[in-house]
């Protein structure tokens, strides 16, 4: 997980979600994250090392970002859920995920933790450095977490408990269009939010959905 907060803070406090909203579709769109209602119960992490570099590159290349980013390596356990079983559960109950949302889920390799990632699950922090000339991100200095407790690494294979089954309209689904890095993977807002994490919120790039809207409203 990529975050702009320094290791001493994260190693002390761990990561916490914005709130208690278990609507997974809102989380995947970013509607319940920093750019939206800021009440998501889910903490987004990724199994993809490449994705952490992509996330860091997006924010380092932004003229509005002037901080340092860290990649936090986290040991998953029973509080971590792969989103696919829950997405399948929602799909079976009539919830529609757009092609765009499917792409985001596939590209981001997202694993979510519910409400809190304790310090003892956080292995280390690695400073991510940015070369503006080559637009490349690389690993810098690493810091181990003295509070980390070793153990087995696994992901809960079940559906997320108390998952909200939303009633989704076509008009609501329009909000799904945006940056390929969803708002929950964006750095902005709540600076308390991990596998790999981030924080500091910037507006996603505008996606021109007019052609798609014409098809939706035929």
Model-assigned labels for residue ranges:
Residues 1-218:
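NAD-dependent ADP-ribosyltransferases
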């Amino acid at each position: 997980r990529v975050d702009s907060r320094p290791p001493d803070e994260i190693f002390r406090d761990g990561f916490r979600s914005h709130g208690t909203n278990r609507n997974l579709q809102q989380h995947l769109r970013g509607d319940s994250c920093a750019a939206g209602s800021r009440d998501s119960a889910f903490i987004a992490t990724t199994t993809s090392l490449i994705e952490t570099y992509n996330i860091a590159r997006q924010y380092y290349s932004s003229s509005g970002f002037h901080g340092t980013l860290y990649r936090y390596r986290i040991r998953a356990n029973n509080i971590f859920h792969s989103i696919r079983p829950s997405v399948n559960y929602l799909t079976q109950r009539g919830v529609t995920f757009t092609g765009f949302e499917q792409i985001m889920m596939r590209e981001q390799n997202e694993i979510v933790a519910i409400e809190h990632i304790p310090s003892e699950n956080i292995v280390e922090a690695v400073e991510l450095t940015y070369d503006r000339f080559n637009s490349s991100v690389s690993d810098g200095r690493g810091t181990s977490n003295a509070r980390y407790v070793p153990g087995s690494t696994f992901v809960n294979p079940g559906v997320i408990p108390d998952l909200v089954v939303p009633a989704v309209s076509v008009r609501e689904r329009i909000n799904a269009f945006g940056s390929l890095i969803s708002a929950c993977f964006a750095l902005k807002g709540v600076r308390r939010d991990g596998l790999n994490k981030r924080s500091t919120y910037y507006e996603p790039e505008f996606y021109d959905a007019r052609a798609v809207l014409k098809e939706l409203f035929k």
